[in-house]
C-alpha cells in the first residue's frame, strides 16, 4: 500500500488505545532502501525502546513518524490522524505545510543535538512554540514553562542562555521544550549520544520520571541498555531496515529468540 494508495481503517487512540500506528513503511534514499516494511503499534502510555546497530534504520523511522522524512509507501498515524498526508477523493495525498505543522504539534521530538535557539534563554526556548503555534498567552506559557523547567531540575536556569549550560542541561531544556506543546507522543533520537559520560545519568533520570511519574507515551531510540531494561514496556530490535524481534525487557534481554539479536546483545552487554 503506497503513501498515495488505498485507504486503511482509521485508528484513534480513543477507540483502540493506540497513539501511534505504522504499517508497511518503506523509505529509500536513492538506491539505498533504509526501511523495508516497518509495522509498529504503540499504545497510550506505553514506552517503547528501539535498539539496533548503526545504519539499521532506527533514526530514519523516528523521523518518518513526524514527517521529517517522507515515506515512500505505507501508513503512519498518530492519534488516528495520518501524518503528512490527507484523504482526498478516496486517495491519500501529501498534506499542506500548515496542516503538517499542526500534526507535528501532537508529536514532541528530542534530537541527538539539542537544537536550542542560542539567542533565547532556557525559559524563552521552552515557551516559544506554545506562544507561536498553540497561541497560548505569554503569561500562561511562562507559568507552564517554569513548571516544566522545575520538573527537569532546572528551575534556577530559566534566565540562562544555552551557551552557559552544560550538554546535559541543554538536553533537559530540550525535553522541557518538547513537553511544552503537550504532545500525545514523545520521540527521543539517541538523546544521550552527544553527551559527556558524566551527565548522561541526569538526562536518563528525567526520561525515567516522564515514564513512571507522567505516564508519557514514548518511543526511544537508544544505545542505553540499562534504560531500556528499566524503563521500557517493550524493546524492539531493528536490523537492516526491518523489525526482527520485540518483547518485554525481561524476555528480550534474558531470552532473545533471534540469532542476530543474540549477537548484538553479546557485544554491548
Regions found by a protein language model. Give the residues of each.
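ABC-family P-loop ATPase nucleotide-binding domain
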Residues: 1-26
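C-terminal boundary and immediately downstream tail of ABC-type ATPase nucleotide-binding domains
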Residues: 2, 246, 250-269
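ABC family nucleotide-binding domain
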Residues: 17-249
Amino acid at each position: 500500500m503506497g503513501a498515495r494508495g488505498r485507504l486503511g481503517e482509521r485508528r484513534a487512540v480513543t477507540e483502540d488505545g493506540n497513539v501511534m500506528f505504522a504499517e508497511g513503511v518503506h523509505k529509500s534514499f536513492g538506491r539505498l532502501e533504509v526501511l523495508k516494511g516497518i509495522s509498529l503499534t504503540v499504545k497510550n502510555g506505553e514506552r517503547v525502546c528501539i535498539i539496533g546497530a548503526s545504519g539499521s534504520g532506527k533514526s530514519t523511522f523516528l523521523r518518518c513518524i513526524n514527517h521529517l522524512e517522507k515515506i515512500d509507501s505505507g501508513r503512519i498515524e498518530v492519534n488516528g490522524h495520518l501524518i503528512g498526508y490527507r484523504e482526498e477523493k478516496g486517495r491519500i495525498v501529501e498534506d499542506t505545510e500548515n496542516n503538517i505543522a499542526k500534526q507535528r504539534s501532537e508529536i514532541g521530538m528530542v534530537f541527538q543535538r539539542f537544537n536550542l535557539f542560542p539567542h533565547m534563554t532556557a525559559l524563552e526556548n521552552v515557551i516559544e512554540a506554545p506562544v507561536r503555534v498553540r497561541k497560548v498567552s505569554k503569561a500562561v506559557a511562562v507559568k507552564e514553562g517554569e513548571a516544566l523547567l522545575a520538573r527537569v531540575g532546572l528551575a534556577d536556569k530559566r534566565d540562562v542562555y544555552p551557551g552557559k549550560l552544560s550538554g546535559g542541561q541543554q538536553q533537559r531544556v530540550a525535553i522541557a521544550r518538547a513537553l511544552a506543546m503537550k504532545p500525545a507522543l514523545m520521540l527521543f533520537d539517541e538523546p544521550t549520544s552527544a553527551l559527556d559520560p558524566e551527565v548522561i545519568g541526569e538526562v536518563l533520570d528525567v526520561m525515567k520520571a516522564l515514564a513512571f511519574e507522567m505516564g508519557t507515551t514514548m518511543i526511544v531510540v537508544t544505545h542505553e541498555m540499562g534504560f531500556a531494561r528499566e524503563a521500557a514496556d517493550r524493546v524492539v530490535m531493528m536490523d537492516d531496515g526491518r523489525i526482527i524481534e520485540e518483547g518485554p525487557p525481561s524476555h528480550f534481554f534474558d531470552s532473545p529468540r533471534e540469532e542476530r539479536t543474540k549477537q548484538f546483545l553479546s557485544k554491548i552487554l
